[in-house]
Amino acid sequence: MSTSTQNIPWYRHLNRAQWRAFSAAWLGYLLDGFDFVLIALVLTEVQGEFGLTTVQAASLISAAFISRWFGGLMLGAMGDRYGRRLAMVTSIILFSMGTLACGFAPGYTTMFIARLVIGMGMAGEYGSSATYVIESWPKHLRNKASGFLISGFSVGAVVAAQVYSLVVPVWGWRALFFIGILPIIFALWLRKNIPEAEDWKEKHEGKAPVRTMVDILYRGEHRVVNVLMTIAAATALWFCFAGDLQNAAIVAVLGLLCAVIFISFMVQSSGKRWPTGVMLMIVVLFAFLYSWPIQALLPTYLKTELAYDPHTVAQVLFFSGFGAAVGCCVGGFLGDWLGTRKAYVCSLLASQVLIIPVFAIGGANVWVLGLLLFFQQMLGQGISGILPKLIGGYFDTDQRAAGLGFTYNVGALGGALAPILGALIAQRLDLGTALGSLSFSLTFVVILLIGLDMPSRVQRWLRPEALRMHDAIDGKPFSGAVPFGGDKSAFVKTKS
């Protein structure tokens, strides 16, 4: 960038079409967040009406994560083949219909299935919206694009909490899900009023359709085997999270089966770059394991252990959600300043100072608890706003939506496991201690995985001939691509 360009405020580097693209995707992500967190807000009410155990109730949160890997794969491939815009609209319609079905659910099984539909739509929205905005903005602003976009999910959670305090005490929990149908109107507007992402148009204009992940897996020579493996993975996940299996050994075997299937899909679709894809799934898995016990079970903790009424719960969740939203935006600035990986590590380290006090002070002072949650979520959860940018940089444009969608949403199974882990540990400890200890310990795993750039490092160890040296989104070097003490003369002298 020239000196004169650097002196221009960052927001003036964006034209009206780029701002419109961002605004549309951000609103879509807000609605996604609104619909997705509704179940966490009314979990105790649903549990009471359906007569569920705590673990069964937590599995309703997990259900949306179980289907996400397939939604990310299918809708991501749609985005790679037909454009990011169509995938985004389809995703919004899917999760809206699933939310409406939750409102009519007569029992546990029906609601579980509706949550599976929500998960598919949410996965598609994540992959398509993230790639859409990132590919529409200039390269030097793409951490901001990612962080600002993901803040919409947290804002949606804040809005949902406020609507919960107004609607549920008067009309009951089902009314909250009926409101979730409104995003369909927005989806129809999107289809007619937003342009396609610039990177995608440049890559595909006048060219034959790309061979997507769906083509490789379900139209290639191994299509029959892959269909059978897809059914096997879906069945195994169903039994793990909804089958009420009491035998830990069986659950472990089913989990291992799913891992083998997902790695097989990654090897087939990514070729020699499969080590990068597998490591990205592991990064996301632990990112969800450290963050989602709090995201999913904080409302339950506030209502049961702290005995807060709906109005006070909404107050505290406002601080939490608003902190995460602010953190996404702050993370965007940090990422463009320090580099994506360095910003991630610094923010998570700072968040560790706050996680224990959040669950140690009790509920006597709502304002102190709210402020602690605000800053903890700003630093710990908000930095995940640049995770799409981090993941997307490992994939080329023609595979980015499916690559991001699949790796992220397979890893997001950590979000399915997280609330159940929290609920199980809470059977021996109090819920607050369970949530705090899980988050504190697992955050360090994410710090190591991202700080050491393990996707590039493992790629270098296993298949060095396919090693990518630079981020495909912003061109910055991958620190894990060169051994410690190795020759880094090939790197561009820029922040990493």
UniProtKB/Swiss-Prot annotation:
HAMAP family: MFS_NanT
Entry keyword set: Cell inner membrane, Cell membrane, Membrane, Sugar transport, Transmembrane, Transmembrane helix, Transport
Record-annotated membrane-spanning stretches: 22-42, 58-78, 86-106, 116-136, 148-168, 170-190, 224-244, 247-267, 278-298, 313-333, 353-375, 406-426, 431-451
Function comment: Catalyzes the proton-dependent transport of sialic acid.
Gene Ontology terms for molecular function: carboxylic acid transmembrane transporter activity; sialic acid:proton symporter activity
Annotated Pfam families: MFS_1 (PF07690)
Localization of this protein: Cell inner membrane
Alphabetical list of SUPFAM superfamilies matching this protein: MFS general substrate transporter (SSF103473)
Keyword Cell inner membrane belongs to the record: yes
Entry keyword Transport: yes
GO cellular component: plasma membrane
InterPro entries in the record: MFS, MFS_dom, MFS_trans_sf, SA_transporter
Similarity annotation: Belongs to the major facilitator superfamily. Sialate:H(+) symporter (SHS) (TC 2.A.1.12) family.
Organism: Citrobacter koseri (strain ATCC BAA-895 / CDC 4225-83 / SGSC4696)
Catalytic activity: N-acetylneuraminate(in) + H(+)(in) = N-acetylneuraminate(out) + H(+)(out)
Membrane topology: Multi-pass membrane protein
Superkingdom of source: Bacteria
Chief localization: membrane
Protein name (record): Sialic acid transporter NanT
